[in-house]
Amino acid sequence: MDINVVITRCEDYTETLARNTRKVLPTIGRLLLISTFVEDGLRLLFNTHDHVNHFSYNWGLNYHFSLFLTIVMIINLLFGSLFVMMRYKVTESSAVLGFTIFAQVILYQLYTTYHLLTRNISIVAAIMLLVAENMLRKPKPANYTQLPRDEHEIEVTSVLLAACRVCLNLMLISMVHFDMSYTRILLCIISYGMMIFVWLGFKTRMMSFMLATWLFAYNIVLNDFWNKDAELHIIRYDFFQTLSAIGGLLLLIHTGPGEFSFDELKKKW
């Protein structure tokens, strides 16, 4: 079978899927996206003493201030996730979640490890997709077609979507390890090929769907924390962060690549 025919059929299938699931896909995407924040908030809640000691020992903070800092992060993570899921003050809630991620990168010194840093940048990109998706779904006034076109908002959402496409796929870069087998190296090369397509905004929905499917399978097979006792916390952390990246890809399928993409340029040509 001609490869162009296969690609066209895959594109048609993805476009049909995006249309048929336009009401439920954003909800699934948001649910997967906030999973890492819920898990993080619950982990802080049930291990408050350990985190308070971490801040006190590593940063020399007062015990009560360390406790206050931990409680604030718990509230931000859990209530921010709840508000996002309820579509209540999405932009503000996303900003709170993004600020909390930034604070954790500093407080836990995650910037010293590329594996953790790239994953957190990927999660921030997924949060930005929440903002872009919320802007795109804002109701338009009844006489919107008769009003002058607001170019500013379209430009903002397009910039957000372009930035999200680039940063979201950093999750894949974090999967590279020096002790990888040849099979995993081959899988990474294939996934990086799809990642470049998403970066460029070329056949974005199809490639985002393929990446989301691949990441889901990768996550279930290699981050099965329910079957492992050793390094449980690290594997569980990777599992939920990968889920959030998948949620971001599902939102990208729903929103589309935006104006700054090859897909949109092809339409203008």
From Swiss-Prot:
GO cellular component, one term: endoplasmic reticulum
Pfam family, one: SURF4
PROSITE patterns registered for this protein in UniProt: SURF4
Record GO biological process: Golgi organization
Topology versus the membrane: Multi-pass membrane protein
Locations listed in the record: Membrane
Chief location: membrane
Transmembrane segments: 65-85, 156-176, 182-202, 206-226, 242-262
Keyword Ubl conjugation: no
Keywords recorded for this protein, A-Z: Membrane, Transmembrane, Transmembrane helix
Motif (Di-lysine motif): 266-269
Entry's free-text remark on domains: The di-lysine motif confers endoplasmic reticulum localization for type I membrane proteins.
Protein family (similarity comment): Belongs to the SURF4 family.
UniProt name for this protein: Uncharacterized protein T02E1.7
Organism: Caenorhabditis elegans
Upper taxonomic lineage: Eukaryota, Metazoa, Ecdysozoa, Nematoda, Chromadorea
